[in-house]
C-alpha cells in the first residue's frame, strides 16, 4: 500500500511526498539531495593530538570532562551554553578521544559561513590532521581526518560518524526541518553532541528521551556578564534619528557596530538613509554576493558599521562590537534570535562589554522573553 512506504534517507512517510516510477515508490521530500557518498573505509592519516595555545576556564574544563565521559560511555549530550561561552572548545577533548581510536569525526552546522569560519580554528586545534569543509559548491572531496560540513551535506555520510557534533541546532534552516534532522540521525554510528545557546523545550525533551544528558554553561570564558539589552520604544522617524546619533557616537569612540534589521527590504531602505549621514558602512544579507568581502573589510576597520539581516546573528566575532536592533518588535524577531543577536556584543576578553539596544514601537512578548532570559543567565552564572 502507498502509505506504508517510508523513505530510508529522510524517514518521510507522507503520501503527498511519495511518487511512483514504474510502480516503484520514491521520496519527493529529499529527491533534490543527490550526489556521491563518502567512503566509509577512510582511515585517519595524521596524528590526532589536540593543541591549544590558551587555557580553558574552570567551567569549560568541567563541561569538557563531562562531555568526554559521556562520549566514552556512548551517551549523547546537549550542551546549553550562552553565546560567547566557548562552546566549540568544549568538544575538542572528545574529538581527540574518538580520533585516537581511529573513528570518524564530523562537525556540522546549518550555515555555510560558520563552516568556513570554523576551518582555521579546528586546524589550529588539530594541526597534524587534515580538515576539510563540505558545503554547497565545495563538495569534490568528502573524506578527511576531520570533516566540517553544513547539515545539508549529511546525506553523503550514512552511518559514518563515530562522533558527530551539531552546532546551532536552533538555527535556520535546521530548526524544524524533518529532512535535515533525519540526515543527521542517519549519519551517526556512534555518539552525538548538540550545541546551542537557545535550545527549545522540545530539544531538551528529545535528548532526555534518547537517554542523553543536558549540560549547562551560563558563564562566558572571560567571566564577564552578558550585555543586557535596553529597549527604546520609538516610532520609525525617531528610530532612524536615534540610530544615526548612536552610529556617529560609536564612530567617535572607534566602536564597530552591527545594525540588525528583520528583512532585506527594510535593510536596504534603512542603509540608503543612514549612508547619507554616516559614512563607512555597508549592507549585508544572504542575497549579497559581496557579504564575506564586506565582513572582512569590517574586521579590518574599513567599514565602521554594517546594516545586516539575521545572517550575522551567529558566527562572526568582532572586538568591542556594539549592537542595535531596529524594528525589534517585528514578528520575524523571536526571543531566540534576539538572544543570539545580543550575544554578538562583549565576546572578547580585552573588550568584554558592549551596548545592546533594541528599538521598536512597543515591547513584545518576544522582546521581554529575550531580556528576561539574558538576565536569568547572568544570575545563574553568579555575575549579578
Predicted regions: what they are:
Residues 1-45:
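Interdomain "pre-motor" coupling segment immediately N-terminal to P-loop NTPase/helicase cores
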Residues 159-163, 168-231, 242-245:
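Post-DEXD/H (motif II) to motif III coupling segment of the RecA-like Helicase ATP-binding lobe
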Residues 80-88, 98, 103-118, 247-274:
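Conserved strand-helix element at the start of the C-terminal RecA-like helicase core
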Residues 52-73:
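N-terminal pre-P-loop "Q-motif" helix
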Residues 129-143, 283-309:
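Conserved helicase ATPase core of P-loop NTP-dependent helicases/translocases
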Residues 189-202, 344-371:
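Conserved segment of the helicase C-terminal RecA-like domain
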Residues 168-171, 299-304, 308-352, 360-365:
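Conserved RecA-like helicase motor core of SF1/SF2 enzymes
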Residues 77, 211-272, 278-281:
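Conserved interdomain linker/interface between the two RecA-like ATPase lobes of SF2 helicase motors
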Amino acid at each position: 500500500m502507498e502509505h506504508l512506504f517510508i523513505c530510508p534517507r529522510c524517514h518521510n512517510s507522507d503520501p503527498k511526498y511519495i511518487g511512483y516510477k514504474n510502480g516503484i515508490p520514491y521520496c519527493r521530500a529529499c529527491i533534490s539531495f543527490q550526489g556521491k557518498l563518502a567512503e566509509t573505509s577512510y582511515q585517519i592519516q595524521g596524528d590526532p593530538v589536540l593543541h591549544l595555545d590558551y587555557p580553558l576556564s574552570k567551567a569549560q574544563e568541567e563541561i569538557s570532562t563531562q562531555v568526554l565521559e559521556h562520549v566514552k560511555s556512548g551517551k549523547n549530550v546537549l550542551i546549553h551554553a550562552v553565546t560567547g561561552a566557548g562552546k566549540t572548545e568544549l568538544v575538542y577533548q572528545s574529538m581527540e578521544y574518538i580520533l585516537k581510536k581511529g573513528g570518524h569525526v564530523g562537525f556540522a552546522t546549518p550555515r555555510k559561513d560558520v563552516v568556513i569560519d570554523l576551518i582555521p580554528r579546528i586546524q589550529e586545534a588539530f594541526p597534524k590532521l587534515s580538515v576539510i569543509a563540505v558545503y554547497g559548491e565545495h563538495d569534490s572531496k568528502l573524506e578527511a581526518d576531520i570533516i566540517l560540513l553544513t547539515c545539508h551535506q549529511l546525506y553523503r555520510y550514512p552511518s559514518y560518524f563515530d562522533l558527530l557534533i551539531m552546532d546551532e541546532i536552533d538555527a535556520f534552516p535546521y530548526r524544524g526541518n524533518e529532512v535535515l534532522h533525519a540526515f543527521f540521525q542517519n549519519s551517526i554510528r556512534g555518539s552525538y553532541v548538540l550545541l546551542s545557546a537557545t535550545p527549545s523545550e522540545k530539544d531538551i525533551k528529545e535528548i532526555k528521551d534518547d537517554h542523553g544528558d543536558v549540560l549547562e554553561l551560563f558563564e562566558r570564558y572571560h567571566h564577564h556578564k552578558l550585555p543586557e539589552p535596553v529597549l527604546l520604544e520609538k516610532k520609525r522617524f525617531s528610530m532612524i534619528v536615534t540610530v544615526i546619533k548612536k552610529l556617529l557616537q560609536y564612530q567617535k569612540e572607534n566602536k564597530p557596530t552591527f545594525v540588525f534589521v528583520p528583512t532585506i527590504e527594510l535593510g536596504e531602505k534603512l542603509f540608503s538613509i543612514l549612508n547619507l549621514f554616516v559614512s563607512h558602512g555597508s549592507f549585508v544579507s544572504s542575497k549579497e554576493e559581496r557579504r564575506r568581502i564586506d565582513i572582512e573589510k569590517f574586521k579590518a576597520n574599513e567599514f565602521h558599521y554594517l546594516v545586516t539581516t539575521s545572517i550575522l546573528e551567529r558566527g562572526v566575532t568582532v572586538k568591542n562590537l556594539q549592537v542595535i536592533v531596529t524594528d525589534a518588535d517585528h514578528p520575524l524577531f523571536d526571543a531566540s534570535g534576539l538572544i543570539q543577536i545580543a550575544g554578538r556584543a562583549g565576546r572578547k576578553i580585552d573588550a568584554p562589554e558592549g551596548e545592546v539596544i533594541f528599538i521598536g514601537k512597543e515591547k513584545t512578548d518576544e522582546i521581554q522573553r529575550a531580556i528576561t532570559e539574558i538576565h536569568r543567565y547572568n544570575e545563574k552564572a553568579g555575575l549579578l
